[in-house]
């Protein structure tokens, strides 16, 4: 119907888009604070200690955040309790551009440099990993092949593109 359900101000500038599951909405401020709203009212706030440019993902009463440093954090949407952190080794140089963070069935899909990882959203463990970008070039900047958002999901397929390179699709099942 287009009827406004709620409107609010969090009192800070937003660094990335809004993530929502219809009940909870989550944003990250430019000061690195995760703000979660429940029905438009502030539920809780957490300092992240990392720069974030990818919109949070809200799914299954959890809030997932992907930092520019490729660290993935999971929080309980109800009380803000940190559930787990996934930090993978990778290249020192990363992009300050929105990455890939999506959900499919019981798997969290996360861009980790040029690779797409399927992560268990309950435990933060990597179930599978697939290379989607091919770093090429003579220096670190030319070799950047981080997956950048937004990703597109069509049925069981997820399509993404890497920085300075072609895109690709994979079957998530």
Question: What are the functions of these language-model segments?
Answer:
Residues 148-173:
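Beta-propeller domains
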Residues 29-30, 67-68, 111-113, 162-163:
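Structural signature of WD-repeat beta-propellers
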Residues 70-71, 81, 114:
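Tandem repeat domain/solenoid detector
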Residues 38-41, 76-80, 121-124, 171-173:
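Short loop/turn segments that connect beta-strands within beta-propeller blades
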